[in-house]
From Swiss-Prot:
It is a single-pass membrane protein. Its main location: membrane. Keywords: Cell membrane, Membrane, Oxidoreductase, Transmembrane, Transmembrane helix. Its EC number is 1.1.1.-. One of its GO terms (cellular component) is plasma membrane. This is L-sorbosone dehydrogenase. The chain crosses the membrane at residues 8-24. The keyword Cell membrane applies. It comes from the Bacteria. It is found in: Cell membrane. One of its GO terms (molecular function) is oxidoreductase activity. Converts L-sorbosone into 2-keto-L-gulonic acid (2KGA).
């Protein structure tokens, strides 16, 4: 038995022991998907009846990293190589105006709440390469000679608190920590910020079930849009602890006021401006524990003031009967998202491709990083895809950009794609928080600047 198999056996045994101790003796049936990921993809996904379980199906890809010259597999006409290696759980990317790339190295801040589900979740996350001590810093990467490989790196900011989203507005760099939005003075070309940060506004903290907070500046620089995920799967701990969560907020930079922009979004992650319509788009990870086929994660154009269902309903007005008390008044107002890309695929990074230097077939759509499932059988995600757009809306079937993050038997993961960014040449950068690498995707005839 390999070392990874032993670790998985130990974790599985511990999970079983916790469940038995809590009185759950037949909790998870051998539940498997009954339809393909493709069936749960597109503007009108197939939504079968729920198959509820106390705990989700656990189907872990044990992390093994990349060895030697191993790398993800690019689509035909594309090439991939490592832009930077040896990072420490790189989660998010941000390009500065001079072409420097910021990398948020971050992990969950953890929780002091010791419920059975939380303890099980901690064991599972440890097996998929998450749940360790957070580096709590931002790394700067610089390619000085234009060969497509970062040859300079430095600790740009440290002593943060599970940082994630970043946005430069004028000469101020904003960073979304797990507990607050903070800002720092920025001078172009510097490789480290020594100045102390200033808190711009508090964000929901304490127990952080979904801890990542992302930000996106408005085109005029007056506003930051802030994502805040829910504190549970489906209000498991009551709605009181969900105050200010599962939504996108709008932060007015001049006044410091934070107000809700859209609600009912279980775990919104990346935000992006669609170039033709100017609409705000978001990637959202949906709920668990109602089967391998539900609920599809999605992207959608965000409507101001809209309610997207969580926790009372999903994908519009499909009622989640687990939530008590029910709120039929809110369900009646819930709107369906624009486009699904399969259950439990775990969307994170998105990047519109209008500034890409990849071949023309990849320049009118949206790149999406699917971090990959741990609770679906068979697994889903673990790839970077491209969704074609027409006139500002998804149009057509997604295409793979990068695959090969799983081993051939799908039992192990070389990596898991997370954040995306386009570098100054238009190449696609992909953060890989298991492989501890930032990958760079180009056309086969365009490997450098």
């Amino acid at each position: 038995m390999t070392r990874s198999q032993i670790r998985l056996l130990v974790a599985t045994t511990a999970v079983t022991a916790l469940l038995v101790a809590a009185g759950y003796r037949a909790v998870v049936s051998p539940e498997e998907a009954r339809q393909t990921v493709a069936a749960g993809t597109g503007p009108h996904p197939v939504l079968p009846p729920p198959n509820p379980t106390f705990m989700p199906t656990v189907n872990i890809a044990t992390p093994v990293g990349w060895q030697g010259t191993q790398a993800p597999t690019p689509a035909a006409g594309l090439a991939v190589h490592a832009f930077a290696t040896g990072l420490d759980h790189p989660r998010w990317l941000y390009k500065l105006p001079n072409g420097d790339i910021l990398v948020a190295e971050s992990e969950s801040p953890g929780t002091d709440i010791k419920t059975v589900k939380n303890r099980i979740a901690g064991l599972v996350m440890g097996q998929v390469g998450a749940g360790g001590k957070s580096p709590d810093r931002i790394i700067l990467l610089r390619d000085t000679d234009g060969d497509g490989i970062a040859d300079q790196r430095s600790v740009f900011l440290d002593h943060l608190y599970s940082p994630f989203g970043m946005a430069l507005v004028g000469d101020t760099l904003y960073v979304a920590n797990a507990n607050a939005l903070v800002r720092f003075p920025y001078h172009e070309g510097e490789t480290h910020i020594d100045a102390p940060g200033e808190k711009a506004v508090d964000l929901p903290a304490g127990y952080n079930h979904h801890w990542t907070k992302n930000i996106l500046a408005s085109p005029d620089g007056s506003t930051l849009y802030v994502t805040v995920g829910s504190n549970s799967n489906v209000a498991d701990n009551g709605m009181e602890v969900e105050e200010g969560r599962a939504r996108i907020d709008r932060f007015d930079i001049a006044t410091g006021k934070l107000t809700p922009y859209a609600t009912g979004l279980r775990n919104p992650n990346e935000l992006a401006w669609e170039p033709k319509t100017g609409a705000l788009w978001v990637a959202v990870n949906e709920r668990d524990e109602i089967g391998s086929d539900l609920v599809p994660d999605y992207i959608t154009a965000v409507k101001e003031g809209a309610f997207y269902g969580w926790p009372y309903s999903y994908y519009g007005q499909h009622v989640d009967v687990r939530v008590k008390p029910q709120r039929p008044d809110l369900v009646a107002s819930a709107i369906a998202p624009d486009y699904a890309l399969g259950p439990h695929t775990a969307w994170f990074g998105i990047a519109f491709s209008q500034d890409s230097s990849l071949p023309a077939a990849w320049r009118n759509g949206l790149f999406v990083a699917q971090h990959g499932s741990w609770n679906r059988k068979p697994k889903s995600g673990y790839r970077v895809i491209y969704v074609p757009f027409t006139d500002g809306h998804p149009d057509g079937t997604p295409r793979d950009v990068l695959t090969g993050f799983l081993t051939q038997d799908e039992d192990h993961a070389h990596g898991r794609p997370v954040g995306l960014a386009l570098d100054k040449s238009g190449a696609l950068l992909v953060a890989d928080d298991v492989g501890n690498t930032v990958w760079r995707v180009t056309g086969t005839d365009q490997k450098t600047d």
